[in-house]
Amino acid sequence: MAELTTIARPYAKAAFDFAVEKQAVDSWAEMLGFAALVSENETMRPLLAGSMASSALAKLFIDVCGEQLNEHGQNLIKVMAENGRLEVLPAVAQLFAEYRLEWAKEVEADVVSATELSDAQQQQIGVSLEKRLARKVKLNCSVDAGLIAGVIIKAGDLVIDGSVSGKLARLSDKLQS
């Protein structure tokens, strides 16, 4: 995965910089997301890995995407096909999404709780994280009964483990040392 990210980064950065310059970040995110889905299609995958000429592959890919790609999106596909890099489109789309969140001063936070959180609890967690991180926070909530009680919050590099299972694990580590 790290190798794909390394290969995808220059394409994602160039696309993002261009999208910001043209004030089209949202439309570029949609285009790249759609192109990533096409590249992951089980019918398309063997073609991307095959020995088809780059111009023919780019034309086929653009035809499949149809109206979902504008002229500039088509140019990106042509360049990536020329360099044999269409298979990294999902990584390009993922990096673009990360750049977009950073640019918009937003961060996604994964909140795992032992039980379903109420809307008020989700709002309280969101407000607290926004104050702490000085960014707009989008919560992705899930339930894991294995936590016993409490929550685990992951937002970028920040991890807050307020779960009973986490506290028990830390207590066990202290007792064993």
UniProtKB/Swiss-Prot annotation:
Topology term for the membrane: Peripheral membrane protein
The entry's keywords: ATP synthesis, Cell inner membrane, Cell membrane, CF(1), Hydrogen ion transport, Ion transport, Membrane, Transport
Single GO molecular function: proton-transporting ATP synthase activity, rotational mechanism
Major localization listed first in the record, in broad terms: membrane
Coiled-coil annotated spans: none
Subcellular location: Cell inner membrane
Function field: F(1)F(0) ATP synthase produces ATP from ADP in the presence of a proton or sodium gradient. F-type ATPases consist of two structural domains, F(1) containing the extramembraneous catalytic core and F(0) containing the membrane proton channel, linked together by a central stalk and a peripheral stalk. During catalysis, ATP synthesis in the catalytic domain of F(1) is coupled via a rotary mechanism of the central stalk subunits to proton translocation.
Summary of subunit composition and partner proteins: F-type ATPases have 2 components, F(1) - the catalytic core - and F(0) - the membrane proton channel. F(1) has five subunits: alpha(3), beta(3), gamma(1), delta(1), epsilon(1). F(0) has three main subunits: a(1), b(2) and c(10-14). The alpha and beta chains form an alternating ring which encloses part of the gamma chain. F(1) is attached to F(0) by a central stalk formed by the gamma and epsilon chains, while a peripheral stalk is formed by the delta and b chains.
Family, as annotated: Belongs to the ATPase delta chain family.
The name this protein goes by in its record: ATP synthase subunit delta
Native source organism of the sequence: Shewanella amazonensis (strain ATCC BAA-1098 / SB2B)
